[in-house]
Amino acid sequence: MSGAAGNKSRIALIGFGEVGTLFAKELIASGRHSVSTYDILFESAQGNELKDKARGLKAEPCPSASAASKDALVVISAVTATSARDAAEQAGGYLKPGQFFLDINSVSPETKRADEQAVARSGAAYVEAAVMAPVAPYGIKVLLGGKRAGELAALLNPSGMKMRAVSEQVGQASAIKMCRSVFIKGIEALAVEGFLAARRYGVEDRVIASLDETFPSLNWENQAGYLISRVMQHGRRRAAEMRAKFS
């Protein structure tokens, strides 16, 4: 399928938050795709501002998810973790055979498998995605799972993506990310609690010096700031994702 933009294939983004915006920038910059998008916040008080942001990136804001997905080769679900199931259920009603549904939401493997069943009734191909490291300028590193995961990776990687199919079984990619997240978020939680306590007692510099002696390659002064800043920046979203994964 291709949209109105000549030979460019259309990509639809359902959800235009932090991750959706990253994907839009990458896909549009490649010059290979036109991008349409819908976000539930388009209907809110901040809707005009968000739609202007989309237009500024040369993405087309649409009045509904089904409108954004019309004629799209790939429909990317990038909503909040708590809305992922609803988005998949709705997509099962408007997607068509020949389309891909790429579920990049950070939810449990069980939720991804339920999403697959919801989309299957439409005849579209479901592919799960686990976004591992959206780091500019090196592309968005993504693990894929599903019977047509390899096909979708081959389609989108020329557009600057760093996608890798890890399994034909839906749930494996999400399981990798979920287990990795246990380590990453645990380390960050230890850093926040440890360094804030050290600062409270006025021994932060001595604690950092001691850590540098034990782990000399890690540069704990820089690591402390980095780990704490990640918690401050992403804490609310991560809390919602963790509730969704273990509910």
Located regions from the model:
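Helical "substrate-binding/catalytic lid" subdomain
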Residues: I176-S247
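Conserved beta-strand segments of alpha/beta enzyme cores
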Residues: S34, E60, F100, A125, ...
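A generic structural signal for well-ordered alpha-helical segments
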Residues: L27-I28, A54-R55, V119, L156, ...
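Rossmann-fold NAD(P) dinucleotide-binding segment
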Residues: S66-Y126
